[in-house]
């Protein structure tokens, strides 16, 4: 039976709060390890005295959830339970064994988004509909990184990119994919006519998956990947951020600064009911703000105001 595995780093001080949150949202098991294990800073814990609980200064917590759990829903529930904690660098993956992971990918089928965009697993034939001259075919191996097109948040972004391409607003444009996961959005944008793209993610596994998928699509020369702290400070004509509402709010200044005047932005990973706060948060920088809903998830899109009309956020 597969499980959804969550990992995070915390301190001895914040451990009880993280543990309470994980228990509240239904973690089936929680384990703790020294975050400095296998390094020169590893610290051995000897037999504790009576009434003492031995803990390291920094810990890596691992929690298991039912394999049918939605990682984004779990993360949203954790943020709602204790919004004062930093959930921005939580990692998720499906675990059991590599055979199960490959079996899941074998079940992943070709999908179409909008008029021209097709996501096709690397090990399957291109469907007949994707042979049209203007079709944008993305060959994908999602691996362990989030973003295969099957989740509503990703689908909302793919349809948005497709609509930009249809209206001619993606051709030759520069693209930032913040929270790139498997690289599906950056690669789709390039296939739809963007000139170059940058993928940013906190998870090194995501950057590896993005680079691998860029290679599968012969786009490695047009797609660069970075950890957030390493990303060059520059602006883009199109920015898409498929993360979560709390991170979108925190990063509003950063993301707004990445969009050129007149450029387009799409924000996804937003649960229905969270959109009003984000619309207000991004209004100082963006106009023509509108929402689209897919089940319980929302996408916000907008156009960057001209430089003379910007405000401080």
From Swiss-Prot:
Q: What is this protein called?
A: Ribosomal protein L11 methyltransferase
A molecular function annotated in GO for this UniProt entry is: protein-lysine N-methyltransferase activity
Record HAMAP family: Methyltr_PrmA
Q: Which organism is it from?
A: Xanthomonas oryzae pv. oryzae (strain MAFF 311018)
Under the heading SUPFAM superfamilies, the entry gives: S-adenosyl-L-methionine-dependent methyltransferases
What EC number(s) does its UniProt record assign? 2.1.1.-
CDD domains membership: AdoMet_MTases
GO CC annotations, alphabetized: cytosol
* Top EC class for this record: transferase
Compartments (UniProt record):
Cytoplasm
The yes or no answer to whether the keyword Transferase is present is yes
For biological process, the GO terms are: methylation
Q: Which family does it belong to?
A: Belongs to the methyltransferase superfamily. PrmA family.
InterPro entries, sorted: Ribosomal_L11_MeTrfase_PrmA, Ribosomal_PrmA_MeTrfase, SAM-dependent_MTases_sf
Described by its record, this protein's role is as follows:
Methylates ribosomal protein L11.
Just give the chief location class.
Answer: cytoplasm
